Amino acid sequence: MAKRDYYEVLGVSKDASKDEIKKAYRKLSKKYHPDINQEEGAEEKFKEISEAYEVLSDENKRANYDQFGHDGPQGGFGGQGFGGGQDFGGFGGGFEDIFSSFFGGGAQRDPNVPRKGDDLQYTMTVTFEEAAFGTEKEISIRKQVKCETCDGSGAKPGSKKKTCHYCNGSGHVSVEQNTILGRVRTEKVCPVCNGTGEEIEEPCPTCHGKGTETKNVKIKVKVPEGVDNDQQIRLAGEGAPGHNGGPQGDLYVVFRVEPSDTFEREGDDIFYNLNVSFPQAALGDEIKVPTLKGHVMLSVPEGTQNGKQFRMKEKGIKNVHGYGYGDLFININVVTPTKLNDKQKSIMREFAEVSGEEITEQPTNFKERARRFFKGE
């Protein structure tokens, strides 16, 4: 019986993308998997689907199939000789794949070797104060954990596993390839048992044979003192479960720090904008200013100019790596009064006169401004 067209087997067009081919394979393999579908012919159908996907998911194999079909290239170089425009890549992967098959370079990683689980990432938002002083918070993340019912085996408790029918327990299957040197036989991991050599007879009712289940897990996280935006910590063993008895992956917690209503932060230094009145700036004053650990008095000397910056050493944030503390910088903003009463205006005029300044006061009402405008004053 002639083999069916691989594109027809997967139900895709000849110009289907890799994603479309993968999607079709997943859908069909799930439908006809021998562990799920016990109907007659399902096993053969599954083999046919697996074979079609193996070819169409590989660019070189697919190109070879598109050009030569199931039989592969016939008669070596045929009548084309070396000038027929035939690329070696059309023969199933070229010389590299061929010789790697002969000399062992094409051997695949043993799927039964214990492997560490995947690492996970969680973004945690903390307040400015929590980042400055450190704290402990509890988070809840949804992740894969070992199934408690089957203890990760994937099998129903009390049931047994059976020898894989597809590879007869070897964990590998032989696949023949057409190459420029003829047909080459290679060993590949069994697609049914994934190299274990065993099949689950009765899947676990909780995880349905996967060995893992998705749960909300609560984890306590210590927020380091002095942590800043985009910095992260690693929680060893809090990631996804390992494979074949391997260790769990890690959880990386990335921090997002909310801005403060009082301070601005640059690294370990913090900045505070202090508004002072004209008399305070001119005469000097003792002014109470906030710090991370309460208020302190700042001596503002007489004649302080707008934009002046004062520095309080080690009043900033503790370095997250333990390299001391940052500083607190206080920026002075001299506030000019917008509304003066008559007495205040009189004092200011007197001050200007004593200082030898000639002040041309600007009118505040519309009529006076209009009168001066038309008089050219």
Swiss-Prot record:
Pfam families: DnaJ, DnaJ_C, DnaJ_CXXCXGXG
A cellular component annotation (GO) from this entry: cytoplasm
Positions that bind Zn(2+) 1: 147, 150, 204, 207
GO BP terms, alphabetized: chaperone cofactor-dependent protein refolding; DNA replication; protein refolding; response to heat
Zinc finger (CR-type): 134-216
Domain notes: The J domain is necessary and sufficient to stimulate DnaK ATPase activity. Zinc center 1 plays an important role in the autonomous, DnaK-independent chaperone activity of DnaJ. Zinc center 2 is essential for interaction with DnaK and for DnaJ activity.
Family: Belongs to the DnaJ family.
Protein name: Chaperone protein DnaJ
Phylogenetic classification of the source organism: Bacteria, Bacillati, Bacillota, Bacilli, Bacillales
